[in-house]
Amino acid sequence: MTEFSPDAAALRAALAALGPGRVWRPVHGPDGTLLAPGRGPGPECLDAYVAGLDVAGKTVADLGCNLGYFAFLAARNGACRVLGCDSDPEVAAAANLLARVHGVSNVAFTALDFLAAPAPERFDLALFVDFVGRGVVAKGRLAAVAAAAEAWARREAFFTLHPVYALEALAVPPDVLAARHPNCVRDGRFFVAEALAGLLGPEWSMRRLTDGRLDTGDASLRTKTALLFTRNT
């Protein structure tokens, strides 16, 4: 990365201001320099998340994008245009700096709470990478996620998530969970993928792209599943 570029200097300053707690995934400069390590697995694991996903020629929304690892990956894999959304304005600003430093013109970022704000348009594909987790389930936000998928995705919605949680892993009483998602609490477990499919309804078909697991070599990710929902009409 050219050290004398004003955008490069601004990006380094922005990443330093964010600190490691707000950078979820590795950030690299155009020359491959690691600018921020992120908190999770490396590229070899992350790229496996979307290995079975066809983005070529599609418009893509990366919702809950952080610094846009999957937004940039979608562009490299042939997406024609990508919009990344993150609720943190400083993160979105840093992601836009990153796009400029890389010279990527078909990826942009905006600060937006996509669970509350209306979608500016519908995209061919909406990505929800690692967005649905214990917090979303416990706070009763799964229905809002399904509504966001309906609003943002014209044709497809992609999720990576744990399809099943043990009830003791969730900070919500089982009866509350059962009231929210009938028939999805049984045998001491909550079936997240089933609940999401039920919320999206019969207009969508669900396909597991990873046959029930993300086999990335990282043991912490092996219970995650990549799901693709496709509109039937």
Regions picked out by a protein language model, each given a short descriptive name:
Residues 39-55:
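Conserved alpha-helix/loop element of class I SAM-dependent methyltransferases that forms part
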Residues 68-72:
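Glycine-rich SAM-binding Motif I of class I
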Residues 81-86:
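Conserved SAM-binding motif I beta-strand of class I
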Residues 95-96:
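Conserved SAM-binding loop
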Residues 103-114:
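Conserved SAM-binding strand-loop segment of SAM-dependent methyltransferases
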Residues 127:
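A conserved beta-strand element that flanks and buttresses the S-adenosyl-L-methionine
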Residues 135-148:
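A short, conserved alpha-helix within the catalytic core of class I
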Residues 153-163:
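Conserved beta-strand signature within the Rossmann-like core of class I S-adenosyl-L-methionine
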